């Protein structure tokens, strides 16, 4: 508080700036306490989720990753887009599978989550082949024809959607 009082008379904008940063930091801490799985790197967290090491609630993780990414972006912190995109994809994969019933078992759940994580990486980096290799080699560590089909279809859908949205809104796909 004494630090902010020193700026009171000379630079009120600087004091307001530091207060805004403190408010954003507090909001970020509240979000990360509410959704602890949204903390840290997205790719290692997604790998832990798929291997059963990390437990998470998909909706909290989805909202927490998006909210914390937006807050850190507006606070001026550097943010890489591939990690959050992979974690958003994995949480959406779990959410879609659970909303549609999830009766096909744990293996199908992991296939859907792996495909969606690969789709998130493909949409973030616009490199579909790399996304397929990341999903198969790094995230899942196993190979099966069903997994290959799930990952390929998800990655191709994400790439096509990103490019179509770029053409529709006349925006370079690097901004998505």
Predicted regions and their residues:
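Alpha-helical transmembrane segments and immediately membrane-proximal extracytoplasmic
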Residues: 1-176
């Amino acid at each position: 508080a004494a630090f902010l009082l020193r700026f009171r008379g000379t630079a009120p904008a600087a004091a307001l700036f530091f207060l805004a940063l403190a408010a954003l930091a507090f909001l970020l801490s509240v979000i990360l306490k509410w959704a602890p799985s949204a903390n840290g790197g997205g790719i290692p967290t997604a790998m832990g989720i798929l291997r059963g090491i990390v437990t998470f609630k998909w909706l909290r993780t989805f909202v927490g990753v998006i909210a914390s990414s937006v807050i850190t972006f507006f606070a001026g912190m550097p943010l890489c887009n591939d990690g959050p995109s992979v974690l958003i994809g994995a949480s959406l994969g779990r959410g879609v599978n659970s909303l549609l019933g999830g009766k096909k078992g744990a293996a199908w759940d992991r296939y859907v989550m792996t495909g969606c994580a690969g789709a998130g990486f493909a949409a973030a980096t616009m490199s579909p082949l790399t996304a397929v290799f990341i999903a198969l080699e790094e995230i899942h560590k196993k190979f099966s024809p069903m997994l290959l089909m799930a990952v390929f279809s998800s990655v191709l859908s994400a790439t096509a959607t990103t490019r179509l949205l770029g053409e529709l809104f006349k925006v370079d796909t690097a901004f998505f």
